[in-house]
Every structure is written in C-alpha cells, then in structure tokens.
Design a protein with these regions (language model features):
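Positively charged n-region of N-terminal signal peptides that target proteins for export
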Residues: 1-4
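Bacterial N-terminal signal peptides
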Residues: 7-16
C-alpha cells in the first residue's frame, strides 16, 4: 500500500515547526534584545504591563495604569530574574524569542505559570505616573 500523502504530511509538519520555533534566551541574548527598549506585554490577549530596559541591567516596570517600579535583572540557573525596589521577592522567568517577539514564562516554586507575550517594542521611554500626592 502506497501512502501518497506521507511526504506532504512530513513537509507540513516541518513548516509548522519552523514557524513556531523559538529560541530560549540566555542573559547575553536577552540583554542585546532588550537594552534601550520598552516592551509592552499581554497575557491571554489582555494588556498586562510595560517594562523599559535600561543599561546596566536596570529596569522600570509598570502594570497598565499603575506607578513605575525600579528594579534590576540578572541570570540565575538559566532563568532571567527580576527584583524591584517595591517588592524585593525574586521573580524568575524563561524568555523565548520567536518570529513575533518575546514569550515569557513565569517560573515560580510550583512550576511554570503565567505566560506573557510581547505585543509592542519601542525605543521610547516608559511614561510613569506620579505617586499620589497629599493625604
């Protein structure tokens, strides 16, 4: 019995793999991609937040509509980890670079969690809201 569609199925699988192939990023590739950029992220298609990547592995993060938080990032155990001034608890992520930008997977104590997707990349600085004034 001859399977005439087998080569087509193999080709379709190869094309699907190449379209969805992502490269896991180490600290050096992450730094090259992000430094001097502001990235906007979404989770499950919903706007999530923005982060500006500054020289020296410094960052400014803001959930949409929230105040900016200053922080730093570093590599630990092949993960990209962040610590912010307002929240000193380490937050580690796996970052993958694909044709449509970055995908970030939160790597908490319970295993992989939240996935964020880059939806915009700009060299414009992050616009931070001022803290509440007066009481």
């Amino acid at each position: 019995m001859r399977l005439p569609f087998l080569p087509l199925i193999a080709l379709a699988s190869l094309v699907a793999f190449s379209v969805t192939a992502e490269e896991r990023m180490d600290a050096e590739s992450f730094e090259r991609y992000t430094t001097g950029q502001t990235l906007r992220f979404s989770a499950e298609g919903v706007p999530y937040g923005m982060e500006q990547y500054l020289p020296g592995r410094r960052v400014l993060w803001a959930f949409l509509g929230d105040q900016c938080q200053e922080g730093i990032w570093y590599e630990r155990d092949e993960l990209i980890c962040f610590v912010y001034d307002d929240n000193p608890v380490e937050q580690c992520w796996s970052f993958y670079r694909g044709e449509n930008g970055l995908r970030a997977v939160f790597e908490g104590g319970d295993g992989p969690g939240t996935e964020l997707y880059e939806v915009e990349r700009s060299s414009d600085p992050l616009s931070c809201s001022a803290p509440e004034v007066g009481v």
